[in-house]
Amino acid sequence: MKIAIAQINCTVGDMPGNAAKILDAVKQAKQAGAGLIITPELALSGYPPADLLLREAFCQSCSDALTGLVKAVDGITLIVGHPGFQDGKLFNAASVIQNGKIIQTYYKRILNKTAFFDESYYFDTGSEPCILELAGIKFGIYICADFWLGDLSIEANRRDFDIVLVLSASAYHINKQVSRYQITHRFIQHSGISVIHANLVGGQDELVFDGASFVMNRQGELTHQLGEFVEAIELIEIRNKQPVKGKLTTPQSSMASIYQALCLGVKDYVRKNGFPGALLGLSGGVDSALTLAIAVDALGADNVKTVMMPSQYTANISLDDAHEMAELLGVKHYECSITALFEQYLLKIETDFQILPDSTGSSAMPENLQARIRGTLLMALSNQSGSIVLTTGNKSEIAVGYCTLYGDMAGGFAVLKDVSKTMVYQLCEYRNQMSRVIPERIIRRAPSAELRPDQ
């Protein structure tokens, strides 16, 4: 038989859209001769649904979408992840749909408790394993943490599974795939059972799911590896109750994976929240340069605008480098001096509050004031156009508080909030290896905030 993995990008709360995407995957799988197709965890509702699960209308919409899937699926078996309801309880569920009926439903038994989604707050815990027999093959069905956190090898052996199917919404972090391989290897070593993983792909708020679904046979050999950060429908051929070796997508370098994760995070945050585009302050520095490169790669040059807002402390080379980069990427670039506004603010403060400018340069007020003027202008443009402001601060700056509240922190999405300053430089070098979009001087030049003389 043939099994299809539906590595799809679902949107939280868009049950009709998610159902349509699942049905499209089902159609492709049927045309390719698959007898079974599996989706990621909670594919029907999107992941993580969080407090939407507390809304009756949301839960009803999930149930309606599931009913629609049941009616539409024919000639193939579908295992779909969804919120499940039984006896007044809510579960993280996977239902087996076959010939217009739900023939089995599995309820997740190990619930995630993470900073971004505490499943135990919303879901009840399942108690029973699920066994699906299809085409003479005995499948065990698990959902994400059941496999990653549970010791299932004894149960799998006792149940005499041939293949374990894992529906996952496993979020990306550096070297995450290595960890997945290790856990799967360990399970196979103890059980001798093949494993098929179907993982979610896409950005959802601050999370990025990398996909990278894979299959390992009972010898612990990787037989299929789907791509990272892309949707895919992949067929796995099963012979003698084992997956036959198929397509192995070449793994990307660490920098390539990180860069693609950042691009997908930006793309889906903008797309799924309905923003027409993005804008950012381009300073001529390395952080805003990398943010711009990511934004353009994610959204396209026509959907990104940049604003250079120099003061009397801005060096000419900053103006030149910002202009050059905007030209290299083909984005609409504005230049708006804040010098007059800055001086008017200082005069107003001096006149009304009898606060004299600090000649020693020890006060942060004039520096923060410049950042806040820039933030105000960017937010005004955002309100006018509907485009989201991308902030450009990196993880190192945020961690030590080297940033300005209501200034460079003003915006809707912090692209580099989990990227250290050292990694910023590495990512700039990586991006320029593909094509030169960041002027070399931006990367090589010593960093400066340019908020006071000779800084």
Tell what function each PLM region has:
Residues 1-281, 292-303, 308, 328, ...:
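Enzyme catalytic cores with a strong preference for nitrogen-chemistry domains
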Residues 50-54, 242-243, 324, 349-361, ...:
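Short glycine/proline- and charge-enriched loop/turn segments
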Residues 108-112, 117-129, 136, 158, ...:
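Active-site adenylate/phosphate-handling loop in enzymes that bind or generate adenylated species
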Residues 230-237, 303-308, 316-365, 371, ...:
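A conserved beta-strand->alpha-helix junction
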Residues 259, 263-267, 283, 292, ...:
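Generic hydrophobic alpha-helical scaffold/packing signal
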Residues 269-276, 296-306, 314, 324-336, ...:
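Secondary-structure transition/capping motifs at alpha-helix termini
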Residues 288-291, 315-317, 375, 398-399:
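Short glycine/serine/threonine-rich phosphate/pyrophosphate-binding segments
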Residues 435-455:
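Mobile late-domain/C-terminal helix-loop "cap" segments
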